[in-house]
């Protein structure tokens, strides 16, 4: 089977822009879906991408369609609506989804794509927009190994760690576990940093201590940078997305008969913050949000 030459990209946001930029840099033809957020789209068009009006048009013009959207509801809309990916799917098309999505939704989409004579793989990603721009994302892949090998040259444009996790939906299942871990660390770290600050502890000294021991983590360093230097650039991940990802994890666990008391508490904290107006703020600001909750208790 020939390697894909025509790539379509649906979702040119914080992560999608870097993905598209690196695909173009390697000489692939790229079509992108029109979006009201003009900046990233126009930048890619200026680099040689073609802007198309509907997911159907993107699918029809592509050998490989990569989707990078916010949640399963958005993904299902892009696939199943009248002018969606399914309407433009053709024999030989491969759809690769980077979304952090619910595995049961993934399986439904994969089955529909297969009925069109096309193929589906899930390739959710980790790391940040900085790594997307640098072409150094981590991909957790689920699907047929031969299909993934076929699109590997494209994936190598924007990822430097690609791990095959199993059949279709395995990538999304691994991603939910990964995000539960990282976002759980984030909430614990925010609470610990607030307690340290309120207790008069020198946060720089605390960072030095934690950095030299087993409690250190990338998430700790990112939140500590915000608490100490007000640096909110190291983790550009919205609180609303954090709440969604942990909710997806608990939904997956329900189907596995796994109790999730810790995940439920973490989800409640992120969801409360989102509902109080902090939905679009980045996760490190949970240090401030927890502080404001404690002020209200006085």
Predicted regions and their residues:
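Rossmann-fold dinucleotide-binding core
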Residues: 100-183
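Hydrophobic residues within alpha-helices
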Residues: 19-23, 109, 154, 195
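Hydrophobic beta-strand scaffold residues
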Residues: 30, 51, 120-121, 162, ...
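NAD(P)+-binding Rossmann beta1-loop-alpha1 motif at the extreme N-terminus of oxidoreductases
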Residues: 1-67, 93
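Helical "substrate-binding/catalytic lid" subdomain
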Residues: 169-294
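Rossmann-fold NAD(P) dinucleotide-binding segment
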Residues: 55-119
């Amino acid at each position: 089977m020939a390697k894909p030459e025509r790539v379509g990209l649906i979702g040119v946001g914080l992560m999608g822009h870097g993905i598209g930029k690196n695909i173009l840099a390697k000489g692939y033809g790229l079509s992108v879906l029109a979006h009201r957020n003009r900046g990233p789209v126009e930048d890619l068009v200026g680099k040689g991408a073609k802007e198309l009006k509907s997911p159907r048009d993107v699918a029809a013009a592509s050998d490989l369609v990569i989707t990078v959207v916010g949640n399963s509801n958005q993904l299902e809309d892009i696939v199943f609506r009248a002018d969606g990916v399914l309407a433009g799917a053709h024999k030989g098309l491969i759809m690769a989804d980077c979304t952090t999505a619910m595995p049961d939704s993934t399986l439904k989409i994969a089955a529909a794509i297969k009925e069109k004579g096309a193929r589906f793989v899930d390739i959710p990603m980790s790391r940040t927009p900085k790594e997307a721009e640098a072409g150094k994302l981590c991909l957790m892949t689920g699907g047929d190994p031969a299909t993934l090998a076929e699109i590997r040259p494209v994936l190598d444009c924007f990822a430097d760690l690609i791990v095959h996790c199993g059949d279709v939906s395995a990538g999304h299942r691994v991603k939910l576990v990964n995000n539960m871990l990282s976002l759980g660390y984030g909430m614990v770290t925010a609470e610990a940093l607030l307690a340290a600050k309120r207790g008069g502890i020198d946060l720089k000294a605390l960072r030095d201590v934690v950095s030299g021991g087993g409690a250190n983590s990338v998430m700790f360093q990112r939140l500590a940078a915000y608490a100490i230097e007000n640096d909110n650039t190291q983790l550009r991940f919205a609180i609303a997305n954090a709440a969604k990802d942990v909710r997806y994890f608990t939904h997956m666990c329900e189907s596995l008969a796994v109790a999730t008391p810790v995940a439920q508490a973490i989800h409640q904290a992120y969801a409360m913050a989102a509902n109080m107006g902090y939905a679009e703020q980045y996760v490190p600001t949970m240090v401030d949000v927890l502080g404001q909750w404690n002020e209200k208790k006085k």
